[in-house]
Design a protein with these regions (language model features):
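Amphipathic, small/basic residue-rich leader segments at the start of a protein or domain
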Residues: 2-108, 129-136, 300, 337, ...
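A short core secondary-structure module
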Residues: 158, 167, 171-217
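Glycine-rich phosphate/pyrophosphate-binding beta-alpha loops
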Residues: 175-180, 222-223, 382-387
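Glycine-rich phosphate/cofactor-binding loops in nucleotide/flavin-utilizing enzymes
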Residues: 88, 92, 113, 253-262, ...
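Glycine-rich beta->alpha junctions and the first turn(s) of the following alpha-helix
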Residues: 214-315, 383, 399
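C-terminal helix-coil-helix/basic helical segment that borders enzyme active sites and/or dimer interfaces
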Residues: 37, 289-295, 301, 312-365
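N-terminal glycine-rich flavin-associated loop
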Residues: 106-125, 151, 167
Length: 406
């Protein structure tokens, strides 16, 4: 009887919270940030930060309101600017946002990668300094991991940070730094123990991109876009207070962050598939043709059905893992591997359905949407490299999940 009363009380609290969320969203989510918005309204990919430019002013309004509520990171304790919500409350929040088609208010490496390790490894002062700015989208972060010659063998990195009293002097180069030219700060791995074994001489450092000696150079990809950069550090002075964790103990933090990165990549790919206008069925009907609402190709119908079934199963698996909670683990490598290959397969199916339009690049004879799909397909080739290659994920799975020998 007592268990039933506790359950009934919890349900009453959740129901009450749901009504609160519905009312708040109704009052605070701008019309253009919901499903059914005017298709002519400019869309923003909101990353926040000091350099942010908004085509639609309501994108900034939505970010500010969600950030002030702490709902861009709803599980983070309120003393750090988060929402302080329980898992059950977060589930309700997500359901109600989905119900009105609310747009994600903020895309952020700070949220997806840095904040979780700050909560685990950061000092109280570091949490209070950086977490509220991450949650409100005031500061945009980038990741300084890979270097020329240090990709999959990340621990061989050479960027060094020398002790010069109250500061570290940082010299070196990072590469494939996503949006470094647009970021305000970078979280970077640096070598502070040159005489230590390579895994033991690494530290985790936060660096303001406005510091003298920091420079970036965008890298043009096969898609024609330049989301990645080379990042250079030339005699960059960084306060020692920006060291996260202990000196020479950054490798454990680096690995923990990678698990969070892999988890977000797998979730991001699935969200893109579910919420994308580049739907497989729509594209197939456009390019292959349809009859009585069915795609005019039995084999392709079967391929899409199989892909959609796997997509749904993957989504349920991610949801179950999220509901179970716990720290990011090696299972993130399983999700990253599957999510990567699933996203690549989705684009391969779209390109196959498009026929010769699938190689659209320039020229008035091609639709802009077709040209964008071709470039998006090319971009997916990097999915199996970023965040750790698929081969690295297989190694992690074999050792840490299956317990196989090295």
């Amino acid at each position: 009887m007592q268990k039933f009363l506790i359950w009934e009380n919890n349900m009453t609290q959740i129901d009450s919270f749901r009504e609160e969320v519905k009312q708040w969203l109704d009052d605070n989510c701008p019309a253009s940030m919901r499903a059914g918005a005017d298709p002519e309204t400019p869309l923003d990919e909101v990353w926040g930060g000091r350099k942010a430019v908004y085509k639609n002013p309501e994108s900034k309004v939505w970010l500010d309101r969600m950030g002030a509520k702490g709902w861009t990171m709803p599980t983070v304790p309120s003393e750090y600017g988060g929402g302080g919500l329980s898992k059950e409350e977060v589930k309700v929040l997500n359901e109600e946002m989905f119900a009105i088609g609310a747009k994600t208010p903020l895309l952020s490496f700070g949220i997806w990668m840095l904040a979780p390790v700050l909560l685990e490894y950061g000092s109280e002062e570091q949490k209070k300094e950086h977490l509220p700015k991450i949650i409100k989208g005031e500061i945009r972060w980038c990741q300084g991991y890979s270097e020329p010659g240090s990709g999959s063998d990340l621990a061989s990195l050479a960027t060094k940070a020398e002790d010069i009293g109250e500061h570290f002097m940082v010299n070196g180069q990072k590469v494939w730094t996503s949006y470094a030219d647009k970021a305000d700060w970078i979280f970077a791995l640096v070598r502070t123990g040159p005489k230590e074994p390579k895994h033991d001489g690494i530290s985790f450092l936060l660096i303001d991109m406005e510091t003298n000696g920091v420079s970036t150079k965008p890298i043009t990809l096969i898609s024609g876009k330049s989301p990645f950069c080379e990042t250079f550090f030339d005699d960059v002075k960084v306060p020692k207070s920006n060291l996260i964790g202990q000196l020479n103990a950054g490798w454990a933090i680096a690995k923990a962050l990678l698990q969070h990165e892999r988890a977000f990549i797998s979730n991001f790919g699935l969200a893109a598939a579910v919420g994308s206008k580049k739907d497989l069925v729509t594209i197939a009907k456009k390019h292959i043709g349809e009859e009585n609402g069915k795609i005019n190709n039995g084999f392709y119908r079967s391929e899409i059905a199989s892909h959609k079934i796997k997509e749904h199963a993957f989504g349920l698996t991610l949801q179950r893992a999220g509901d179970e909670g716990g720290k990011a683990s090696a299972t993130a490598s399983m999700f990253k591997l599957y999510g990567t290959e699933h996203n690549k397969k989705r684009h391969e199916l779209m390109i196959a359905a498009m026929g010769t339009d699938g190689v659209a690049w320039d020229g008035d004879e091609f639709d802009d949407s077709d040209k964008n799909l071709t470039k998006a397909w090319l971009r997916t080739k990097g999915n199996s490299l970023e965040g750790g290659t698929s081969e690295v994920q297989l190694n992690v799975i074999s050792k840490r999940v299956l317990g196989l020998p090295s």
